[in-house]
Amino acid sequence: LSAYDAASHKYWRQQLQQQLPEFDWTQLALPARHFNWRIRSNAMQWASQEYERLTQSHDLLLATSMVDLATLRGLIPDLAQIPSVLYFHENQFAYPAGQQRKENVEPRLVPLYSVMCAEQVAFNSAFNRSSCIEGALALSRRLPEALPTRLFEKLEASLVLPVPLVPPPELSAIHHQHENIASAGESAIGTAALEVVWNHRWEYDKGIGLLAE
């Protein structure tokens, strides 16, 4: 389940299906638009529009952190009978607010509810994992009542599973050209050329200012 199917989320789920062909996959995805509405309404949409598909016999439920997993399993009890894995591509605690963006607590709480009901939680990087834990702790101190201890136990027990990257064919020629340049550089100055890869969107939330520095 991919509730906010942005390019990186789409790539991830498609690669899972391609690299694990021994499994019979059923994929459901919602367009990456109207973020606040999408993160809060996806369970309601799927429960009403995909009820028959979601109540078929499945062995495992794999959902991105944008999925309101707690609500979905409540609306479709059959999904509560199979194990679920929650995968964090990012977390709202590490997402920069920006000058025009007001703080909204709800998009931060929805994934935490999902953590509470998932059998296994995984993050795409150690930074994503640690910043989520730190952010949840900071939020807990500000709330009228502290977040449950069980939540932090599950976050601490979570895994780090990087997204497998498969270079697209059009990059092969470019990489080969870079290797030729590197070889020429080695013969000229005795050191290999440095190759830098930027594997993020070119937007403020990805830290382009830090890269420039």
Regions found by a protein language model. Give the residues of each.
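Short hydrophobic "strand-cap" motifs at the C-terminus of beta-strands
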Residues: L1, N124, V196-H200
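A short, Lys/Arg-enriched amphipathic alpha-helix followed by its capping loop at the start of a domain
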Residues: W12-D24
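Active-site proximal beta-strand in glycosyltransferases
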Residues: L61, P77-A97, P111-F123
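Nucleotide-sugar donor phosphate/pyrophosphate-binding loop at the beta->alpha transition
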Residues: A94-Y113, L137-L147
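Conserved donor-binding/catalytic core segment of Leloir-type glycosyltransferases
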Residues: L165, P169, N180-K206, A212
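A short, active-site helix/loop in glycosyltransferases that binds the activated sugar's phosphate group
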Residues: A118-Q177
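Active-site donor-binding segments of glycosyltransferases and PAPS-dependent sulfotransferases
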Residues: W25-I76
